[in-house]
Each structure stands twice: as structure tokens, then as C-alpha cells.
Amino acid sequence: SRGLGDVYKRQTRMFKDLFEFVREGRRTAVVGELLANRRRFAFWPELRTIVGDDADELRTVENIVAEGLRYGETPKGLVSFHRYGDEVRKAVEEHLVEGAQYAAAGGEVKIHFTVSPEHLTRFEALLAEKIPGYESRFGVKYRISFSVQDPSTDTLAVNPDCTPFRRADGRLLFRPAGHGALIGNLGKIDADIVFVKNIDNVTTDARRGDTVLYKKALAGVLLALQERIFEYLMALEVPGAELEPIAAFIENELCVKLPKDYGTALLRQVLDRPIRVCGMVRNEGEPGGGPFWVTGADGVETLQLAESNQIAP
């Protein structure tokens, strides 16, 4: 299919099996399941207008990832994710729905999206079209802002032997870095509490109850910890403050293991910073990080989320 090579380079693991089917004819279980259930997907009505009801398997898959829907080069936020009767919602729309249910304050829902610069106008156009309907449905006003990932955080692509990958013309290839590269974007948001979520980590209306409940619970834990942290920071301003209860709180509640020779300065350093409260799901073999104890250069042990490729074999 025309332009497939270009699209293939930018694929995500979401469509890896589909691209291999188009390029090599390798029909994995994932491809078979998609084709058998294609009429159940949220994008089927749009795909049907392109390929009809009886298109062969190759043409169907080609028109999902390349020609037609071009999902191989479409950001996940703009993929049609869920269908409710005749209503189809893209992933970014589900964030509007979810935000209205736990992130509204004073009738406003503030949502910040970090997107690729080449897709920014598409996000802006879709949200401008959809937001009035959701505001009417939920009785809120949305305040949407955007930022783009800093290109200086892009990572050099490498071959399997860790040598730099080069394009056909000899130029080096840089790819957008992972989620950690967005910490600068997060730091520029003016807010007391920020709920952080992947663009494609959304569920349907029928299953959203647990999401809303636990998001509120995480915020409650954050506020309770924040209240005690502020109290202890004020206590540390008083000469001769008793350090042992503060150190016990840091180790038992914040899960930060202090060195034996800690003092007031270190306790203040640990407490006087942004607070992160994370909800973890059971690891059942899917890709993604997990919680590990990490010892920093200052000798302080903290709980961190780490990917397997960050851990020395």
C-alpha cells in the first residue's frame, strides 16, 4: 500500500501485528480476533463506508492502519475507542466524560493534553466540535490547554546491537522519549492537584464507577498526607524540633528510608517537594513498570516505578 513504509516506522505496539500482516502476510491470533470481530469495533461504521461489508482480509487491515482510517499514524487520542449505540467516542472524548465526574471544581473542568506538534490542530478541531455537547450533558465548563513534548528530549534510535540507526540518506533517527520526558510539561501546570493519565487509559461508561471512586480515593490520600507534611514542615522551622516522629512518618507513610545520620535539613528536603500518589494494578505479564526500592546518590531509599529495561540484568 502506498506510503506504508513511512507509516510502519511510526507504528506503536498497538498495531504491530496488523502491520506485519500487511507486510508479510503473518496472521497472528490478534489479527484473527480483530477480523472476526471487526463489526464490533467502534471504528467499524467509518471503516465500512470505505471497504464495504465483504472486503477481503488484507484490504480490511490495510484500510485500518494505512490507507483509509490511517490509524498507524493517528495518535491514540483520536482513535474511535468506544461505541454506545449510534454514538462513537474517541479516546480524548472519554477524558472529557471522566474529568467531569471527579475533577470538576466550581463548575469547571481543567484538562491539559500533551500532544505531538504535528497532531495539535486535529485535537483542537475535534475538541472544539465536541466540547459544547459534553458541557451541556454534564453541566460544566471545560478549560482545555495543550503543550507539546520538548524535542530536545527525543531519544536516538538504535539497532539491535545498540549502534545508531540511520535513515536511508544517512541521517540519524530520533524518536519521542517516554512518559518521563513530560515531567517538564507537568511542572508548568498551575494547579494544586493534577490527575495524570495516559490518553488511551480510558474505560466505558458502564465500567467507570471504579475509576471515579479510586481517583477520589487517591486525591483523599494526597490531601491527608499533604496536611501532615505541612504540619511537620512548620515544626521543623522551630529550633530543637523533635525529629523522631517526623522521621517515622517519612519512613512509614511516605515509604522513604532515611540514612541513620539524618538531620533537619534532610527531613525538610524530603518533605518540601511535590507529592505523588500512585495506584498500582497487579502485574499479570503485560508491559509496564512496577514498584521497586531505589537507592539514590544521597543514600536515601525511595519507592520508584521502574521499567524492566531500567534494571541491570
Locate the predicted segments by residue.
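Catalytic or ion-translocation cores adjacent to nucleophile or general acid/base/metal-coordination motifs
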Residues: R10-E46, D205-F230, D298-P313
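Structured alpha-helical segments in the cores of large, soluble enzyme domains
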Residues: D54-R70, D86-A104, L127-E135, H179-G187
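Short, conserved secondary-structure transition motifs
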Residues: V115-R122, F146-P160
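Long, charge-rich alpha-helical interaction segments
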Residues: I50, V202-Y262
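Flexible, glycine/threonine-enriched loop-and-boundary segments that flank and lead into catalytic domains
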Residues: F165-L172, L254-I311
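Short, small-residue-biased leader/transition segments that mark boundaries at the very start
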Residues: G3-Y8
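Structured mid-domain segments that build the active-site/substrate or prosthetic-cofactor binding neighborhood
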Residues: L172-R207, L218, I229-Y232
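Active-site cores of enzymes that catalyze phosphoryl transfer or operate on phosphate-rich substrates
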Residues: R40-R83, E87, C162-F174, L182, ...
